Amino acid sequence: MEGESTESTHNTKVSDSAYSNSCSNSQSQRSGSSKSRLSGSHSSGSSGYGGKPSTQASSSDMAVKRNKDKSRKKKKAKSPAQATAATTTTIKSLEQTEEPLLVKPNNGSCEQQLELQDAQQLGAPTPSDAHDAHGDKPQLDVDEQQDDPQAEQIQQLETATAATISPDTMSASVTVTIDGCTSMEKTCEWTDRPGRLEAHAACIGKQHVQQQQHDRVKEDSFCCVISMHDGVVLFTTANLNEMLGYPREMWLGRSFIDFVHIKDRATFASQITTGIPIAESRCSQSKDARTTFCVMLRRYRGLASGGFGIIGRPVSYAPFRLGLTFREAPEEVQPDGCTLSNATSMLLVISATPIKSCYKEPDEFLSPKGPKFAIQHTAAGIISHVDTAAVSALGYLPQDLIGRSILDFYHHEDLSDIKDIYEKVVKKGQTVGATFCSKPFRFLIQNGCYILLETEWTSFVNPWSRKLEFVVGHHRVFQGPKQCDVFEMSPNVTPNIPEDEQNRNACIKEDILKMMTETVTRPSDTVKQEVSRRCQALASFMETLMDEVARGDLKLDLPHETELTVSERDSVMLGEISPHHDYYDSKSSTETPPSYNQLNYNENLLRFFNSKPVTAPVDTDPPKMDSSYVSSAREDALSPVHGFEGSGGSGSSGNLTTASNVRMSSVTNTSNTGTGTSGGENSASGSSNPLPVNMTLTEILLNKHNDEMEKCMLKKHRESRGRTGDKTKKSVIEKMPEYSGPGHGQTMKRGGSHSWEGDANKPKQQLTLSAVVVAPTVSVSPAEDSQTTAKWQAPMTGSHLFQSSYNFPQSINLWPPFSLGLTTPTVHTTHTSMAQKSFSPQHNLFPAFYYIPAPLATATAGSAAAQTSVSSASAAQHSPKSSENPSTSQPEATAATAMPMPYMAGVMYPHPSLFYAYQPMPFPSVSGAVQMSVQSSGSQSNNNNKSIYTMAPASTTTQKPGAFHSITPAELNKPDAPDTLLHTETSPKISVQEAPKKELSDLPSTSARRGSSSDQRNNSNNPKKYTDSNGNSDDMDGSSFSSFYSSFIKTTDGSESPPDNEKETKVHKLKPIVEHPEEDQTQHGDG
């Protein structure tokens, strides 16, 4: 026996050790003495059995020694009738035993059994034994079921277990004897309440068996209850012997997992772990919720079936379908009133039903009502699910098939038909729920035979991935195998298949797998894909085309500069072509291609041409220009005049901060320093430049000029916008002297914007009082030759010319590189008083353009007004060399009471707001200042349509109001000088240069219209223009013009035609202007 118990192989580990420790004697078997159960030599070592006692429901406060129970029981009084009844009960139990071996009875255990029987039958136990009698289980026999004491004991058991069991429904085969309970009490050391959990397990087992008998009367099964605390068997039914051959007592206290096949233990454990959470949430589950799976349980190897040769016999297993149900033991009440929870005493009720082969005869044909089962496999051919109904037909348990390839079970001769079947499966899978039936094919079963199956196929294609997910075959056995027992092990015989056949079969299997793993395409998908491909191609072509159009020559790709200054951001780009320049990176400013037509003066010129004026060139000789005018004319040709209210795009009224306004002489410059350059170095070069000839402005010439200027404007804009983000203010300032043109510091800005962010709060109308400069002036005489032009012009401070005892060399740069100004209180205090006295136009530097106004109805007959306007051409700039000296001037203003004037065709009028937008800035008179006298140029003809271009003289003794100041009648009545020549006085150290009158008339921006009172009275017959409340003409509202265009427009009486040499020089004048766009650096600004 020791050899059997110590055998290491699993063939003899479980059954033989349990068999060697079992007792055939009913008294010793049922007494469960500690001597027979706890003997170390014959213990099997299995959990909950033999030498490994359980610790379930044991605690220190409930532990009571067994010897005290024996001592109390020995003191009881025994009667012969009670002993006879107990002996009869044990004899009946002995007859039911199945073990042939005999063992000497244990007298102590028999005595204990008798004492317990006496106490239970009396029904009134002693107070000292009441606790023990209440905890023991009663013995129930058929002959004693009607006794009152036993009926009362049954009621107590029902109350303790919360189960309703009627005594008449119990049978002897399912009753639990006292000896079994005491045996478990001894083995598991359940002190204080011996057999309580077993009694509860027994009641649950009896209920389960009764339910099985009620539901499945014809099906044989056994039931067992397992403790989830340690996994031992607490209860099992007697028909266990019929199913597996084990005596019922051999399973008690043994671990259930020892009887499960090794390959099925993982399945059993997984079902337990998944079933426990379901059992714990019983509030939402049915009380008898079951989990069903199949395992192989071990058969018993007894002497009756195999004799005494135990080691050499193989261990056999039988398939069973197990149903799992979880129950929980109720709470127990201790003597002290405390409640002990049995949460750890969760019970597992297993109902085991044997599975038998469904075939009765070899190769039998089954009816359509034959066994049906389903097998599911993936697109890779791996089986993922098998019904439990397939076990009786195939002999495989579900866990035996899951994970294996379905192609391994098909007969090799049927693979061609299987391939056709799967082609149809994939095709039908495109329709959800579509099924089809295939012709029968052979399938391999457990015993190595083949059965013939009729299958209904269905498949599922993922609508998103368009791939086959799984295939389900609903099989029905059409013909059975040659061997009926499907659970027999198949002989390890490999079928003899030729090599070429094997290769062909392998190729067919690969084709089937490839077919199932490929993406499923529908016929309509092909059309959709083609349409989608064409749409994508069209979209790609359109994007490419749009990109090419967007990358045209006029597109400006502006960089995203992160360090733009305030002035750069607020500056007007491209002559203020767009009103959306609030932010430099706005979409409108970066994506709108610049248009030259948006410039204000171009619009006004178009209005001028639309009015269809009668224009003709003057009858005088072709005018000539000196180098200073050439330089200024080139710049003014590109300079847009804007920034007034009502002009297209600016919206700022009166703030003349653009480049063209800088050149409008000293009266409109918004800089704080005076204008003036040191031009002595340029005398030779200036005189040698070819002098362009005035040309008649025509619409064709304007369009040609606009086209050329637009290209230059785009070029300038790209260059100015191509700066990097890390360019600092210092680098910008250093770059400014490279630009040509006067007043380049005053770049093209919006009205109200500042020149630089460093002087954001600097007043716009200030005077620089710190530097009083003695200006070398020019004395002009009519007797000089044309080559002796005046090249020395005086720099001005505060729009004044001064003569002082301080003499400066001609070549010294008298001006700072940038226009800076200082706020001086003197300027503001003397502003009002000296406005009319300390300001006088510098006619020798800034050409004046006189208008002949019509007298008002309320004015006297001899009163008229002559207003002066200064064009944007600055005479201070002589050549590109002198452009390094920024020349600026202080703006002058006139009174608001401007007289209305008649419109004169061909005459360019400045914006009306220029006459009153700026107040004249005073400057204290300096002793010894240059004396200037204005001399009359003679009387004019009565037609008043001819322009006489002369240089305005400097005042001698009296200072007159600004150039835009309205001329009062009192001033007109003053006698004029006898001759029309202009002259100035220079300092003693400066030589006087003279020029003929013909060359002085070459300055196109300078014209003086003077006449007597009779001439002015003749002017009153002219039609009166529409004027506003301020007396301003609305003919050219909201516009100003550059000197380039003002030089074109001349009026005449129409009696003369332009000379031939003027026609010849039209193109020559425009060409040098266009060829030098770089000289006009102030047109587009710095940003």
UniProtKB/Swiss-Prot annotation:
Post-translational events: Phosphorylated with a circadian rhythmicity, probably by the double-time protein (dbt). Phosphorylation could be implicated in the stability of per monomer and in the formation of heterodimer per-tim.
One MF annotation (Gene Ontology) recorded for this entry: transcription cis-regulatory region binding
Entry-linked CDD domains: PAS
Region (Disordered): 1-98, 123-153, 613-692, 736-759, 871-893, 956-1087
Keyword Cytoplasm recorded: yes
Biased composition (Acidic residues): 141-150
Compositional bias annotation for Polar residues: 1-14, 655-664, 877-892, 1003-1024
Feature: compositional bias, Basic and acidic residues: 129-140, 1060-1087
Single biological process term from Gene Ontology: negative regulation of transcription by RNA polymerase II
Bias (Basic residues) ranges: 65-78
Entry keyword Repeat: yes
Annotated PROSITE patterns: PAS (PS50112)
InterPro entries: PAS, PAS-like_dom_sf, PAS_fold, Period_circadian_regulator
Compartments, record wording: Nucleus; Cytoplasm, Perinuclear region
Motif (Nuclear localization signal): 65-78
Biased composition (Low complexity): 15-46, 79-93, 665-689, 1028-1047
Record keywords, A-Z: Biological rhythms, Cytoplasm, Nucleus, Phosphoprotein, Repeat
Residue ranges occupied by any PAS domain in the UniProt entry: 220-355, 373-479
One GO location term (cellular component): nucleus
Function, as annotated: Essential for biological clock functions. Determines the period length of circadian and ultradian rhythms; an increase in PER dosage leads to shortened circadian rhythms and a decrease leads to lengthened circadian rhythms. Essential for the circadian rhythmicity of locomotor activity, eclosion behavior, and for the rhythmic component of the male courtship song that originates in the thoracic nervous system. The biological cycle depends on the rhythmic formation and nuclear localization of the TIM-PER complex. Light induces the degradation of TIM, which promotes elimination of PER.
Subunit and partners: Forms a heterodimer with timeless (TIM); the complex then translocates into the nucleus.
Name recorded for this polypeptide: Period circadian protein
UniProt organism field: Drosophila virilis
Lineage: Eukaryota, Metazoa, Ecdysozoa, Arthropoda, Hexapoda
Gene name of the record: per
